[in-house]
Design a protein with these regions (language model features):
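Alpha/beta-hydrolase fold catalytic core
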Residues: 1-35, 56-59, 97-98, 181, ...
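Active-site loop/oxyanion-hole signature of alpha/beta-hydrolase fold enzymes
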Residues: 19, 26, 62-107, 117, ...
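Conserved HGGG/HGGXW glycine-rich cap/lid loop of the alpha/beta-hydrolase fold
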Residues: 21-71
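Conserved loop-alpha-helix segment in the C-terminal half of the alpha/beta-hydrolase fold
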Residues: 54, 226-264
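Short glycine-enriched nucleophile-adjacent loop
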Residues: 109-120, 126
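Flexible "cap/lid" loop of the alpha/beta hydrolase fold
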Residues: 117, 125-159
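Conserved alpha/beta-hydrolase catalytic His-Asp/Glu region
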Residues: 137-141, 163-225
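Catalytic histidine-centered segment of alpha/beta-hydrolase-like enzymes
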Residues: 264-277
Length: 284
C-alpha cells in the first residue's frame, strides 16, 4: 500500500535490521556512494530536492531514516549522539559501502563528524551542513520564540511527553519555518508526512529522549580534533549557530574547508539544494 510519505518517493525503498531496530532507507543509482542523514524530527524526504540534482549514473544515493524517525522503528533506548552514530555505522557496514561521501544536516552532520573522528574506514569525505553541536538545552531553541517554548517544555516532566506528541502538520510547519530563511521553501506535504511518521509507535518518546540528551551533541565537539578525513563544513548564513561557534569548528577540525551559503537557514537541503549538490559533486 502506498503511504503518504512513499507516494513522493522513487521505488528504491528498503528496510533492514540495525542495532535492534528496523531502518528504512532509499538506495538508487550506481557509482560513488553518497550517504544522506537528516536531522531531528525529520526524515529522508528532507533530501529529495538535493538528490534530484545528482546524476545517479555517476553516484549511488543512500538516504536514511534515523531510528525513531520517518518510517524506521523506535527501539526503547536512550537516543544519544553515540546511539545514532552506532546505528548509522551499523548500516554502512551492512551495506558494505566503501569510499562514501557522507552528507549530514544538523544532527546528521554531527553524526558524520563523529564517524570521521572514529576513523570509520567506509567514509572518504564528510559534507557537514549546519552541525548541531551548540546551545544549552539544545540549539533548536534559538530558531524562533515558538521553538524556544517547544524545545524547552519538552524537557520538563509531565508536560514534556505531551509536547513530544503534539506534532500536527500545522504546528510542524511553524516549527520547520524556524529553520528557513524563506518559509516558502518548505515543500508541500512534508510537514504532513513528518506528522504522520511522528505518530508511529515509540517515535514521540524517541524525539523527547533525543532532546533530553542534548549534552551528548555538545560533547561530540571534543572528538573533532581526531578527524583526518577531508571535511567540507557548510553553514547557512542564518543558521542557528553563532559565528564564533562556526569558526571554532573550522579551527577544531583539521583541514576543514568552510563554506557559507547566503540567504540560507538551518535546513539548507530545502533552501539551497543546488548548492549542496554542487558541494557533493565537487567537495574540494
Amino acid at each position: 500500500m502506498t503511504t503518504p510519505a512513499s507516494r513522493h518517493m522513487p521505488p528504491d525503498i528498503h528496510r533492514t535490521a540495525v542495532n535492534g531496530g528496523d531502518v528504512r532507507y532509499l538506495r538508487a543509482g550506481s557509482g560513488t556512494p553518497v550517504v544522506f542523514v537528516h536531522t531531528l524530527r525529520t526524515q529522508l524526504e528532507m533530501f529529495l530536492q538535493v538528490i534530484e540534482q545528482l546524476d545517479t549514473t555517476q553516484v549511488e544515493v543512500i538516504a536514511i531514516d534515523l531510528p525513531g524517525h520517518g518510517e524506521s522503528t523506535a527501539p526503547p533506548v536512550d537516543y544519544t549522539a553515540g546511539y545514532f552514530t552506532d546505528a548509522v555505522e551499523g548500516l554502512l557496514a551492512h551495506l558494505d559501502l566503501h569510499k562514501a561521501v557522507f552528507v549530514g544536516e544538523s544532527i546528521g552532520a554531527s553524526i558524520g563528524l563523529i564517524l570521521a573522528a572514529r576513523g570509520n574506514p567506509r567514509i572518504a569525505h564528510v559534507v557537514a551542513v549546519n552541525p548541531y553541536d551548540y546551545g544549552r538545552w539544545g540549539g533548536a531553541r534559538r530558531s524562533s520564540p515558538l521553538n524556544n517554548v517547544v524545545f524547552t517544555t519538552i524537557l520538563w516532566p509531565v508536560l514534556g511527553p505531551i509536547v513530544a506528541r503534539a506534532g500536527t502538520p500545522g504546528l510542524l510547519r511553524l516549527v520547520l519555518a524556524g529553520g528557513l530563511h524563506d518559509r516558502h521553501k518548505l515543500p508541500p506535504g512534508l510537514a504532513g508526512d513528518i506528522a504522520r511518521c511522528g505518530r508511529l509507535p515509540g517515535h514521540a518518546r524517541a524525539f523527547r529522549s533525543l532532546c533530553l540528551q542534548w549534552r551528548s551533541w555538545l560533547s561530540a565537539r571534543a572528538q573533532y580534533g581526531a578527524i583526518t578525513l577531508p571535511v567540507t563544513l557548510v553553514y547557512g548564513d542564518e543558521d542557528w549557530s553563532r559565528p564564533a561557534e562556526r569558526d571554532a569548528n573550522a579551527r577544531d577540525i583539521p583541514g576543514a574547508h568552510l563554506v557559507t551559503l547566503k540567504a540560507t537557514g538551518h535546513f539548507a537541503s530545502l533552501e539551497t539544494p543546488k548548492e549542496i549538490a554542487a558541494l557533493i559533486q565537487a567537495p574540494d
